[in-house]
């Protein structure tokens, strides 16, 4: 499997494009100078485009991906707020942008050539909205709102319009601050990391009714941790066996084993990582994790033990200034 890793560094306005080798080694393919502070990235489902959010002029850039994984800018469109998170629906027809500071979610069309157009809908009043996440059925968008301690749910219509889902929201404990999400491959469970108390919530999805219920909440930090909690990112291995969460104050990656049915997490350990790990990701084989240090100007690659989920550091690589986002593409 040929894989490419994209690392966004807003302070130097760059995307570094790396080839990921079979042993976890990285080879630099390209350094892209971006017209703006690049932050969130999303890969199109058909793997032909990379969508990038930039500021201070709030825009989304569409990059064409060639057969090697290299990028060529192909389009630009405006966004209503500073982009905090980008995602698409599973068919690649619509781009969703969450804006934390703008307290909004927007929907933009993606044309037949894979280029994002101007927004067609804007939902306001979502305080601290931190991400938009399409569910496995491609029908419901989950929008964690950190300042509201709740996840809002929206139905996705045929032309991209979002409307309030029958179950309008799920609430967290007070002060948790829901942020980023991941879905289990079996499509029956979702996981949300809470930024302000560094916990993770497990949600069960009822495919028949569309209802959601919280079934577990677990602390991600070591016992006795007394510093400020500041969780950031969450990802799950493709086989659904392991889940990881990053905390920026502690510069740690928390390791969880997932029960066979996906319903239960067990915290098994912690791995020190790059300073202030705001973003990380897992490759498509489930063998490697790439962590970005927002304050270290480096990324680090780890091998994932397939029996325990433990992380073995392999190598560090210098990138741009303030790296915040990691995306991984499987070319074949």
Curated annotation (Swiss-Prot):
GO cellular component: cytosol
Domain of life, per lineage: Bacteria
GO molecular function, one term: 6-phosphogluconolactonase activity
Enzyme class: hydrolase
Keyword Secreted listed: no
Pathway: Carbohydrate degradation; pentose phosphate pathway; D-ribulose 5-phosphate from D-glucose 6-phosphate (oxidative stage): step 2/3
Gene3D superfamilies: YVTN repeat-like/Quinoprotein amine dehydrogenase (2.130.10.10)
EC code: 3.1.1.31
GO BP field: glucose metabolic process; pentose-phosphate shunt, oxidative branch
The entry's keywords: Carbohydrate metabolism, Glucose metabolism, Hydrolase
Reaction it catalyzes: 6-phospho-D-glucono-1,5-lactone + H2O = 6-phospho-D-gluconate + H(+)
Listed InterPro entries: 6-phosphogluconolactonase_YbhE, Cycloisomerase_2, Lactonase_7-beta_prop, N2O_reductase_N, WD40/YVTN_repeat-like_dom_sf
HAMAP family the record matches: 6P_gluconolactonase
Protein purpose: Catalyzes the hydrolysis of 6-phosphogluconolactone to 6-phosphogluconate.
Family of this protein: Belongs to the cycloisomerase 2 family.
Protein name (record): 6-phosphogluconolactonase
Gene that specifies this protein: pgl
């Amino acid at each position: 499997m040929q894989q490419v890793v994209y690392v966004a560094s807003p302070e130097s306005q760059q995307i570094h494009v790396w080839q990921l080798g079979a042993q976890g080694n990285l080879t630099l393919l390209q350094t892209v100078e971006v017209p703006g502070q690049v932050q969130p990235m999303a890969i199109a489902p058909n793997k032909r485009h990379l969508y990038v959010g930039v500021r201070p002029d709030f825009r989304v850039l569409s990059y064409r991906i060639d057969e090697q994984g290299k990028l060529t800018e192909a389009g630009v469109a405006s966004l209503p707020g500073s982009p905090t998170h980008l995602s698409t629906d599973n068919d690649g027809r619509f781009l969703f942008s969450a804006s934390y500071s703008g307290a909004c979610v927007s929907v933009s069309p993606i044309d037949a050539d894979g280029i994002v157009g101007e927004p067609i809908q804007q939902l306001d009043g979502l305080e601290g909205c931190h991400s938009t996440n399409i569910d496995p059925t491609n029908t419901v968008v989950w929008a964690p709102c950190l300042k509201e301690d709740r996840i809002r749910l929206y139905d996705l219509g045929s032309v991209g319009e979002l409307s309030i889902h029958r179950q309008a929201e799920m609430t967290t404990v007070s002060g948790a601050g829901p942020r980023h999400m991941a879905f289990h491959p079996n499509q029956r469970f979702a996981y949300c990391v809470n930024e302000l108390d560094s916990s993770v919530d497990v949600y069960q999805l009822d495919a028949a009714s569309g209802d959601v219920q919280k079934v577990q909440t677990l602390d991600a930090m070591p016992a006795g941790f007394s510093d400020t909690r500041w969780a950031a990112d969450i990802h799950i291995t493709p086989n659904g066996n392991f889940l990881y969460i990053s905390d920026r104050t502690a510069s740690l990656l928390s390791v969880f084993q997932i029960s066979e049915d996906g319903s239960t997490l067990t915290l098994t350990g912690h791995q020190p990582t790059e300073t202030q790990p705001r973003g990380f990701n897992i490759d498509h084989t489930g063998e490697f994790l790439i962590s970005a240090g927002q304050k270290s100007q480096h990324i680090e690659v780890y091998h994932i033990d397939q029996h325990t989920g433990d992380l073995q550091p392999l190598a560090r690589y210098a990138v741009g200034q303030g790296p915040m986002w990691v995306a991984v593409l499987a070319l074949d």
